[in-house]
Amino acid sequence: VAELETIDEERAGSTESCCSPAAQKTCCEPEAKGECCGPGREAGNCGCGVGEVTATVPEDAAELRDTVRDRYAKAALAAGSGSVTCCDDAAQLTEGQRELFGSSLYDSDDREALPEAAQLASLGCGNPTAVAALNEGETVLDLGSGGGIDVLLSARRVGPTGKAYGLDMTDEMLELARRNQAEAGVENVEFLKGTIEDVPLPDDAVEVIISNCVINLSSDKPAVFREAARVLTPGGRFAVSDVVADEDMDEVTRDDMGQWTGCIAGALTRADYRARLEAAGFDQLEIQETHRVHEHAASAIIRARVAP
């Protein structure tokens, strides 16, 4: 694996977020009610954002998947309504996190071409469409397509003779993505319901796979990579943005459900990413870190190829 030099820039977030003192006063005062102000979320500890301990990671894979699905269903509903909820860490990013995740990581020209709801629903850690080197006429699959931001951008790049598939397991995200597709007026797109561990496409169906901060959420990553290799044509390209963990990530972080749904706890180390991709039949692996997202993790671009 070519591990290129880490770009670790300082990113300062706005203090005017759902966890600002003003928000805490109205949302997390003792008499406040509702999900965002439940036990343990007193003033000064709203529970906003990635990293707040609310539960441990379940051992049951189905339960873990349901928890992830619930978080992203909330995110879809929030993005679709254009609303910002106070201290709902399950569905919103703070302003500081928006510097590390979401649509701020895309060029302004790309953002301007997309519906606002697609931008609001973006919870990714990079811009895989910028590094996938998509060509006119290619077929591309986005694993965990969410509100459709990367699918819509990919559809523009492959043109009318190409096609972009989006795969997601969350009904609310699929509904939002299809609305965004209609608003954007893009026709060479199809959104599919399913999981990234069991892709509902035939063998050799696509030439490129992209994904944006999703593979870390899976409890069965070897299955994800096997399915990616299966649906890619021989020589097909794998170009994803994902979080990679440092070797020294502690067990407390690994066992925190909030850190898992926040794309940290389930992240593979660089060595694990390489080993599991190679086991699935990929070669020409490259990992390029882009920015730090946690004390023990970074966002990275991972590129590979299915051996011809």
Question: Where do the language-model regions lie?
Answer:
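A short glycine-rich, Lys/Arg-flanked "PGG" loop and its adjoining helix->strand segment in the class I
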Residues: P222-R237
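Conserved alpha-helix/loop element of class I SAM-dependent methyltransferases that forms part
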Residues: D88, Q92-T139, D150-R157
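Class I SAM-dependent methyltransferase SAM/SAH-binding core
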Residues: C125-P128, N135-D198, A223
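Short, glycine-/aromatic-enriched active-site segment of Class I SAM-dependent methyltransferases
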Residues: A245-I264
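A short SAM/SAH-binding and catalytic strip from SAM-dependent methyltransferases
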Residues: E207-D220
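Core SAM-dependent methyltransferase catalytic element
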Residues: A280-P308
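Short alpha-helix
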Residues: A265-A280
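N-terminal auxiliary segments of SAM/dcSAM-dependent transferases
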Residues: N45-S103
